[in-house]
């Protein structure tokens, strides 16, 4: 790899790449600075005028479940440096960065992870053929001939590949189709979450950045949706640079790559990844510098806006009226001929899978609560309620239980419309709807938790509790139906605008865009940071099509299509104090209503013995994990930190992989004294491990008493890369709190 990079990315070429990157970044950041003032004004105006969607009926979780481990298990990873497959212990913490450890013992002994993968911008592939097609398209002229050795050989029939158009790729495989399905759901959840990297609560910086991206691309005649608007600001900015830099680099270096087609493909992936990392570091520095400059200027800008808000609004409305008079006749004709006829079909294509997905969310929530209620009646009663509710609180973050909801969006197609409206991919809309589904599920669960916690304060009997659970479920479902309708209608409006506005702007550009500079003289110089002609022009275009979009969504609601409420229907708040309940301390179900020591069978004395107490602590630790497919690896042999076990020969069959896995487990652990029951908790060593002092980033390790559960921050998906962050051998390892079940057993809800 080093030879490839030193040959094709020498100092002169790196300098050339840095200069081109600098030019692109400088041009984009001018757009960002312009949009920052507009976004700040819009945000402050919104606060003062109080405009916004109707108040939601469901509560939302203000304190996220940030101590949860989403998933953990074993999988095989292909090591590109030695071309071997290695078994890795992997987990996904609450921040959705895939963390890969050498093995489970390394994780338990707090050895730094091998890698932390930020999956923003990646695609999850389940077929080597799919992957080879994408790789072949990325570098024309390198398609392998029939019968030749491909770039990747998978030893099983169940691969999972993380593919990125610019960054390095990751190769995994599983032993069974069931494992592949589980990991696919988990990795898709990681991608979905990491793609949504700009915080929702960023009311100024976020909108300014996305508007700047759109304006910059439109200045390059690139309209329509952009599939690589993925990740945080620096990742998106890196994608933007690579979109321009990549083709020229490919044309320059592609013909110089030597070897067979698959070898040239491998070389190009290495080069592209190296360039992407260079671009990322440069983009990060530039973006942070500009952001700091804008934040320093923000107080002065806010003072001007507060003082002159009315004058700024008047000036903007005057400008809008002049632009409207100029473009309205052309815009209305364009809307009538090219957009209006297609709005119903676009809306129908969006409504069917989206509404099916939200209905599935409702059904899954209903089933989980009903099953819990039956368990309360038939098994544990109030004593087990804490355990049941601890699991229910994690429902929205359970990749497999939510998968049936997310899958409803997969059939979304805009056949015949994608080319007309320049929609490069429907993945933008799929992921947005799926994120809404997860949010609404969590809101429903949290509202149910809050109402049930209030009911428990009355000290109900088991029978009264079951009736209360059913009554609360019905109340929450009514609130869910209302909020679901509001969220879907807003999603439909936004999606229709996202599809039609770029198309209209592109259609109107030849006759209108060149005339816009003459409107600049209508803006007072003092207000020029808060009013831009280009933005006002886009708002006027939006208004010309907005009435047709609103009418189409309204008609769908009037027809009661897909269970949408009419705009005139307002659900009166039957719980006036409900939102006050959400202001309290987050509910810890395990602590407040957990099992007091009687696990439902056998003798239980007055106070638990030390082993029982340890088991209880372990149970509570396990309750904080959403799901697991962890192999049993109890530690029994001494473990040498930082020693890489010798790599075995590359296995080419399932049998060899099974043998490799068995060898790893024997080397890392002694066999349990007796077979573990299905789903039984695995006893883990509670002995604290001495870790030598090291450099940041991790916080100093405290000495903990034996048996004390450690609950510190897990590794975060690094924003300094496109894919992987490898911890240095000397750095202090992050510590996790997790729970694992016996071999191959998923944590049951």
UniProtKB/Swiss-Prot annotation:
Per the record, which residues fall in region Disordered? 589-749
Q: How does it sit in the membrane?
A: Lipid-anchor
User: Where on the chain is Phosphoserine found, per UniProt?
Assistant: 568, 574, 607, 628, 647, 650, 669, 674, 685, 695, 699
List, as start-end ranges, the regions of compositional bias called Polar residues: 723-749
Q: Give the highest taxon in the source lineage.
A: Eukaryota
Q: Which InterPro entries match?
A: Niban-like, PH-like_dom_sf, PH_domain
Regions of compositional bias (Basic and acidic residues) in chain numbering: 710-719
Instruction: Could you list the residues that carry lipid attachment of the N-myristoyl glycine kind.
Output: 2
Tell me, what is an example of a GO biological process annotation in this record? negative regulation of DNA-templated transcription
One GO CC annotation, please? plasma membrane
Keywords attached to this Swiss-Prot or TrEMBL record, sorted alphabetically, are:
Cell junction, Cytoplasm, Lipoprotein, Membrane, Myristate, Phosphoprotein
Where the record annotates domain PH, the positions are 68-192
Annotated Gene Ontology MF terms? transcription coactivator activity
How is it modified post-translationally?
A: As apoptosis proceeds, degraded via an proteasome-independent pathway, probably by caspases.
Q: Does the keyword Phosphoprotein apply?
A: yes
Subcellular location as annotated: Cytoplasm, Cytosol; Cell junction, Adherens junction; Membrane
Looking up PROSITE patterns in the UniProt record yields: PH_DOMAIN
Q: Belongs to which family?
A: Belongs to the Niban family.
Q: What the protein does? A: May play a role in apoptosis suppression.
Protein name in the entry: Protein Niban 2
């Amino acid at each position: 790899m080093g030879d490839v990079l030193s040959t094709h990315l020498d100092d002169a070429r790196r300098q050339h790449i840095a200069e081109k990157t600098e030019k692109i970044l400088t041009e984009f950041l001018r757009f960002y600075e312009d949009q920052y003032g507009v976004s700040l004004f819009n945000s402050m105006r919104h606060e003062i005028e109080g405009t916004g969607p109707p108040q939601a009926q469901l509560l939302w979780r203000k304190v996220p479940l940030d101590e949860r481990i989403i998933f953990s298990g074993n999988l095989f990873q292909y090591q590109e440096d030695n071309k071997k497959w290695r078994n890795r212990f992997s987990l996904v913490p609450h921040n959705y960065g895939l963390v890969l450890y050498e093995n489970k013992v390394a994780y338990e002994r707090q050895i730094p992870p091998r890698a932390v993968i930020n999956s923003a911008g990646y695609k999850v592939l389940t077929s080597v053929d799919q992957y080879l097609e994408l790789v072949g398209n990325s570098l024309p002229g390198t398609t392998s001939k029939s019968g030749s050795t491909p770039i990747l050989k998978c030893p099983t029939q169940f691969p999972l590949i993380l593919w990125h158009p610019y960054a390095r790729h990751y190769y995994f495989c599983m032993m069974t189709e069931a494992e592949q399905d589980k990991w696919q759901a988990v990795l898709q959840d990681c991608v979905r979450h990491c793609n949504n990297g700009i915080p929702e609560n960023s009311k100024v910086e976020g909108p300014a950045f996305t508007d700047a991206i759109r304006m910059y691309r439109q200045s390059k005649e690139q309209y329509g949706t952009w599939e690589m608007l993925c990740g945080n600001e620096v990742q998106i900015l890196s994608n933007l640079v690579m979109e321009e830099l990549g083709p020229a680099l490919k044309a320059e270096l592609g013909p110089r790559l030597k070897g067979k087609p698959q070898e040239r493909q491998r070389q190009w992936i290495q080069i592209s990844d190296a360039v992407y990392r260079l671009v990322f570091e440069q983009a990060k520095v530039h973006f942070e510098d500009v952001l700091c400059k804008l934040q320093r200027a923000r107080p002065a800008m806010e003072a001007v806006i507060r003082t002159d808000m009315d004058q700024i609004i008047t000036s903007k409305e005057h400008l809008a009226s002049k632009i409207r008079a100029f473009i309205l006749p052309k815009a209305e004709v364009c809307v009538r001929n090219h957009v209006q006829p297609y709005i119903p079909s676009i809306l129908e294509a969006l409504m069917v899978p989206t509404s099916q997905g939200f209905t599935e969310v409702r059904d899954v929530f209903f089933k989980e609560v009903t099953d819990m209620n039956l368990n309360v009646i038939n098994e544990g009663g109030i004593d087990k309620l804490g355990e049941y509710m601890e699991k229910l609180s994690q429902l929205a973050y359970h990749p497999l239980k939510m998968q049936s909801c997310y899958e409803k969006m997969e059939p979304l197609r805009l056949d015949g419309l994608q080319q007309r409206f320049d929609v490069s991919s429907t993945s933008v809309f799929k992921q947005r709807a799926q994120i809404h589904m997860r949010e609404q599920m969590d809101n429903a669960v949290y509202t149910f938790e809050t109402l049930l916690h209030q009911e428990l304060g009355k000290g109900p009997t088991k029978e009264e509790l079951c009736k209360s659970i059913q009554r609360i479920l019905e109340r929450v479902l009514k609130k869910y139906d209302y909020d679901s309708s509001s969220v879907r209608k807003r999603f439909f409006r936004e999606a229709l605008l996202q599809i039609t506005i770029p198309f209209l702007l592109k259609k109107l550009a030849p006759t209108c865009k060149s005339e816009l500079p003459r409107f600049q003289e209508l803006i007072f110089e003092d207000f020029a940071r808060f009013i831009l002609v280009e933005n006002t022009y886009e708002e006027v275009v939006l208004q010309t099509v907005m009435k047709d979009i609103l009418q189409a969504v309204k008609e769908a609601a009037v027809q009661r299509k897909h269970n949408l409420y009419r705009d005139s229907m307002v659900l009166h708040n039957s719980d006036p104090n409900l939102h006050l309940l959400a202001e309290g301390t987050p509910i810890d179900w395990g602590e407040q209503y957990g099992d007091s020591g009687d696990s439902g069978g056998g003798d239980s004395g007055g106070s638990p013995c030390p082993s029982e107490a340890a088991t209880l602590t372990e149970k509570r630790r396990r309750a904080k994990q959403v799901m697991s497919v962890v192999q049993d690896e109890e530690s029994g042999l001494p473990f040498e930190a930082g020693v890489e076990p010798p790599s075995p020969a590359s296995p080419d069959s399932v049998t060899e992989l099974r043998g490799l896995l068995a060898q790893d487990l024997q080397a890392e652990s002694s066999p349990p004294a007796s077979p573990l029951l299905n789903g039984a908790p695995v006893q883990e060593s509670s002995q604290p491990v001495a870790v030598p002092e090291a450099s940041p980033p991790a916080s100093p390790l405290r000495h903990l008493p034996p048996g004390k559960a450690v609950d510190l921050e897990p590794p975060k998906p690094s924003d300094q890369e496109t894919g992987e962050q490898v911890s240095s051998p000397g750095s202090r390892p992050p510590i996790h709190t997790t729970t694992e079940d016996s071999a191959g057993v998923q944590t049951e809800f």
